[in-house]
Swiss-Prot record:
Keywords assigned by UniProt, alphabetized: Metal-binding, Ribonucleoprotein, Ribosomal protein, RNA-binding, rRNA-binding, Zinc
The protein's required cofactors: Zn(2+)
Subunit field text: Part of the 50S ribosomal subunit.
Residues reported in the UniProt entry to bind Zn(2+): 16, 18, 36, 39
Cofactor: how and how many bound: Binds 1 zinc ion per subunit.
GO CC terms, sorted: ribonucleoprotein complex; ribosome
One Pfam family matching this protein: Ribosomal_L31
Record function comment: Binds the 23S rRNA.
Organism superkingdom: Bacteria
Annotated NCBIfam families: L31 (TIGR00105), PRK00019.1 (NF000612), PRK00528.1 (NF001809)
Record-given protein name: Large ribosomal subunit protein bL31
Length: 65
């Protein structure tokens, strides 16, 4: 096997938009995520809608149904 061809694996910080930070291992220098275990509805028990509306809702709105 060739030496020194693999990227360096290191401890990095992961930043969520909710403000949570945690460490993990990666070849990247930093990772930013939109949803983590502190703000995901499954883990928090709070349901929030991330869907703005599908095709059916747009059709009903357009034709007044």
């Amino acid at each position: 096997m060739k030496k020194d061809i693999h990227p360096a694996y290191q401890q990095i910080d992961v930043h969520c938009v909710c403000g949570n930070k945690f460490k993990t291992g990666s070849t990247n220098k930093e990772i930013r995520v939109e949803v983590c275990s502190d703000c995901h509805p499954f883990y928090t028990g709070k349901q929030k809608s991330v869907e703005k509306g599908g095709r059916v809702e747009k059709f009903k709105k357009k034709f007044g149904m």
